[in-house]
Amino acid sequence: MKKYKEIAVKAKYIVVLYDNNAVEVYVKQKVTIAILHKIAGENGLKFHQDTAVENGIEWFAKKILDTLGDPNAIVGGEDCFYINKNNTLICGNRYAGTVKEALRKIAEEFEIDYQDTWNTQQFGRKIINELK
């Protein structure tokens, strides 16, 4: 799990700006208990499968966040999840290509102006600001 500064979510994209100014892009996926178990395991947590099923997916996500000490998001692995300001649980899988490729794709899809000379950090900050 990495420390993040900002997260922007729009359409199928989740864009994360980390404390060290690195940027990562995830693509939304269906939230499942299996994905949450995988994320929990990647962060050294183990939960019994039945406990998660009995209490529901939202409870399970919140339990993982509370245990790891972040009230809103787990980012930095192959998968991520985030609870937005409307209390909606959003799950994503790391974009398969490069970060810059993902940022270009987002910029083109949402008609965001950018410069080819920007580094990933500059580009990522611009995308996050535009998606908010």
Predicted features along the sequence, with ranges:
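Short acidic DE-rich linear segments
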Residues: 131-132
